[in-house]
Amino acid sequence: MLSSQTSSIFTVSRLNQTVRLLLEQEMGQVWISGEISNFTQPASGHWYFTLKDDTAQVRCAMFRNSNRRVTFRPQHGQQVLVRANITLYEPRGDYQIIAESMQPAGEGLLQQKYEQLKAKLQAEGLFDQQHKQPLPSPAHCVGVITSKTGAALHDILHVLKRRDPSLPVIIYPTAVQGDDAPGQIVRAIELANARGECDVLIVGRGGGSLEDLWSFNDERVARAIFASRIPVVSAVGHETDVTIADFVADLRAPTPSAAAEIVSRNQQELLRQIQSAQQRLGMAMDYYLANRSRRFTQIFHRLQQQHPQLRLARQQTALERLRQRMGFALEARIKQANQRQQCVSQRLSQQNPQPRIHRAQSRIQQLEYRLTENIRSRLSEQRERFGNAVTHLEAVSPLATLARGYTVSTTTDGKVLKKIKQVKAGDIMTTRLEDGWLESEVKSVTPGT
């Protein structure tokens, strides 16, 4: 009987070897959770310990080249998650596991799920920059998806009220923690998209542990954010908290308060920009008028240096054209300033900062009135100077001298007769009077005494 079954008889060594190969080949690498006990670390640097639960235990070894990658010091009674290979120690026939990695259970398990989902969604392209939607600038209505009783909502509303009190805010209250939270967050995102009331959404909550923030690592929430037609700003926890929602969102804010800062405009800054624009407009007008005044002065000096009537008439015509161009340019600038002011007023009216806008408009009107009066005064002054110049030029004109009874006599070769030695008896000379010329013959020359 024994002789017929000798081929099935194992030695102890062969049995242990066969069992080891079966365990290693069939089981492969597995994840095991349990409580650490009997932890030791000899001089070799290897770790030896037992993993147990309420009803069973198994011996474990973790060699030095693997345990040096563990980021914490295992303690007796600590719950851990171990990735290990199943094997058999042949000399004693002891079944054991060889650990390759170790992490705390609870958060460690969640971290593993987090990494797996992150890798999956990244492979699908949900994190790609090409899918990110730009945020509206400025936002006309902000939707907030968070708990209606949490500190995050209070922080968001406080920042929005401080920066842009006229900005409409719609709250879509949801749970942000617990088993029902992911579904509620998804429904809130879908509702906001269906109603189309907002042009940007803030999705988030305050800080907490990994378990507290786990709703924002849910695949359903990630896909709802990715599918949203409205740009989404994630604002989950603190700056060091990074969730799957942060990777999928169009923009990640480090905190809920920072998200409110991002989607809102600072009205104080807007008013400073308006005041700066007014100042630049005033400086431009002053420069324009000063430049035209210098040009007018140059023309006036040139008129003084040239002979009167014909050139004076041409310059007067050119001056009139210049005045008209100045008037047209001024009207165009004022019209442009009015248009800009109306545009700014219209934009501000949508944000409802009425008292400040009224004050700004009143200031602009005062500046326009003062500018117009200043230009009129300068034009009147220049006209007066121009009239005085004409009067002066007419006073020194040779024609005016003739009109007072004086005459100018010239010899036959056209030279002006200044002394008697230029003529002699019998010479012919021409005399210019106010209304014409006469020709006379010199009868005699008598020197003066």
From Swiss-Prot:
Enzyme Commission number(s) of this protein: 3.1.11.6
Chain coiled-coil ranges: none
Keyword Hydrolase attached: yes
GO biological process: DNA catabolic process
Subcellular localization, as worded in the UniProt entry: Cytoplasm
Cross-referenced InterPro entries: Exonuc_VII_L (IPR003753), Exonuc_VII_lsu_C (IPR020579), OB-fold_nuc-bd_dom (IPR025824)
Family, per entry: Belongs to the XseA family.
Subunit-structure text: Heterooligomer composed of large and small subunits.
HAMAP family the record matches: Exonuc_7_L
UniProt function note: Bidirectionally degrades single-stranded DNA into large acid-insoluble oligonucleotides, which are then degraded further into small acid-soluble oligonucleotides.
Protein name listed in UniProt: Exodeoxyribonuclease 7 large subunit
Species for this entry: Salmonella typhimurium (strain LT2 / SGSC1412 / ATCC 700720)
